[in-house]
Amino acid sequence: MVMSRGRIPRLGAAVLVALTTAAAACGADSQGLVVSFYTPATDGATFTAIAQRCNQQFGGRFTIAQVSLPRSPNEQRLQLARRLTGNDRTLDVMALDVVWTAEFAEAGWALPLSDDPAGLAENDAVADTLPGPLATAGWNHKLYAAPVTTNTQLLWYRPDLVNSPPTDWNAMIAEAARLHAAGEPSWIAVQANQGEGLVVWFNTLLVSAGGSVLSEDGRHVTLTDTPAHRAATVSALQILKSVATTPGADPSITRTEEGSARLAFEQGKAALEVNWPFVFASMLENAVKGGVPFLPLNRIPQLAGSINDIGTFTPSDEQFRIAYDASQQVFGFAPYPAVAPGQPAKVTIGGLNLAVAKTTRHRAEAFEAVRCLRDQHNQRYVSLEGGLPAVRASLYSDPQFQAKYPMHAIIRQQLTDAAVRPATPVYQALSIRLAAVLSPITEIDPESTADELAAQAQKAIDGMGLLP
């Protein structure tokens, strides 16, 4: 899942998307050879821009036309699946959520990278790619996609309320209780509604505790199969329950998602938050607009004019520095809290991978398009202009990247030692069943919930459908 937000002005983005979608519809008859490039609508502007950059490099040999899928990941997956099962020959390159790799590979919908006629796809996908993103691109020891964007959650906190950021979840819960007793904002902002955000949170806690939902091959449930695995599952569940029931907890915690967590922090209700890096840009933008009571950036004269005509924060480099420097007194970031003290968390990552559809009529050009879309220059553009963390390790040493992402060192480390969600062709069913058992987190009984999670996970991999 990708939770970052783009930075291209929305009006221009809409025009670009419309033009490239029209080009894809026209097809090869009017445009020459066209490679379609299906991406989530949320990042359509960014992907349109890098497609156009590639088209300039190709010099007319062929063109890439970005086409927007729906905004909802579930609807994106369904549309691609329908096109592939219907043998849609206009489908060439697909931006796949990182959890779809096994499903698309097992179904034969995505070509293995070894099918690249030029023989370059596998090496290109591996070279300079961080280990976490790369781990999401394979199935059964074979690469089926090339990472193009990634994401990891951090701890965000109030330095004016918290002396030092908690390093583990026990310290998080203790700090929230201390703040509540002192009459200060005490919520821990999380994603705990019945959905993918809750599964991501649970998976991070589980893997950080030494456990896993499934075996590496996706064939066996490993939540309670050994005493050590059961202990890890119970530990993760205890943390979920404790966060929800500690004194001063968010009373609406069972309905929270990424957006409501961000808002709780910006409104001054939460002093601690685990969330994706999009909250950094959101905090600065809304503070400049006067919407963050504890961070009145709207009162800084040098930031005048940094909000454009459509309400987006588009600062100069100097304005960004001023806003960021001012924010540090009340808005900090730190590594994701550990489960075991002294052992860094293994944080579940999101992102997108590029795969070539089995239905493509232009195999060589589609694989070449993938290489261009994720090359060093376009990775830099995606990160700096699109607000999507890079998958290429070398970019984390780029001074401009570091300026745009002050938390770059934490992001890189967490992407190097990351957790991934269970690799299985039935991930959709597995996720739905896990979320149903975990929700509401206020009613978790760690021991019995561990058993129910294992039972529902087994039903998912046995092909018993989506409903618990």
Curated annotation (Swiss-Prot):
Any idea which GO molecular function terms this record carries? trehalose transmembrane transporter activity
What the record says about disrupting the gene is: Mutants show no growth on trehalose as the sole carbon and energy source, but grow normally on glucose. They secrete substantial amounts of trehalose during growth on glycerol.
> Subunit structure, briefly?
Monomer. The complex is composed of two ATP-binding proteins (SugC), two transmembrane proteins (SugA and SugB) and a solute-binding protein (LpqY).
The protein's name in its UniProt record: Trehalose-binding lipoprotein LpqY
Signal peptide range in chain numbering: 1-25
Q: How is it used?
A: Being a receptor for trehalose, which is essential for the survival and virulence of M.tuberculosis, this protein is a potential target for antitubercular drug design.
What job does the chain carry out? Part of the ABC transporter complex LpqY-SugA-SugB-SugC, which is highly specific for uptake of trehalose. Involved in the recycling of extracellular trehalose released from trehalose-containing molecules synthesized by M.tuberculosis. Trehalose uptake is essential for virulence. No binding affinity for maltose.
- Biological process per Gene Ontology, one example term: trehalose transport
Family, per the entry?
Belongs to the bacterial solute-binding protein 1 family.
Localization recorded for this chain is: Cell inner membrane
Lipid (N-palmitoyl cysteine) attached at which positions? C26
Q: How does it sit in the membrane?
A: Lipid-anchor
List lipidated residues, S-diacylglycerol cysteine. C26
Transport among keywords: yes
Gene designation per UniProt: lpqY
Q: Which parts form a coiled-coil structure per UniProt?
A: none
Which cysteine pairs make disulfide bonds? Answer: C54-C372
Q: Does the keyword ATP-binding apply?
A: no
Sites binding alpha,alpha-trehalose sit at D97, N151, W276, F278, G351, R421
User: Per the record, what is one GO cellular component?
Assistant: periplasmic space
UniProt keyword terms in alphabetical order: Cell inner membrane, Cell membrane, Disulfide bond, Lipoprotein, Membrane, Palmitate, Signal, Sugar transport, Transport
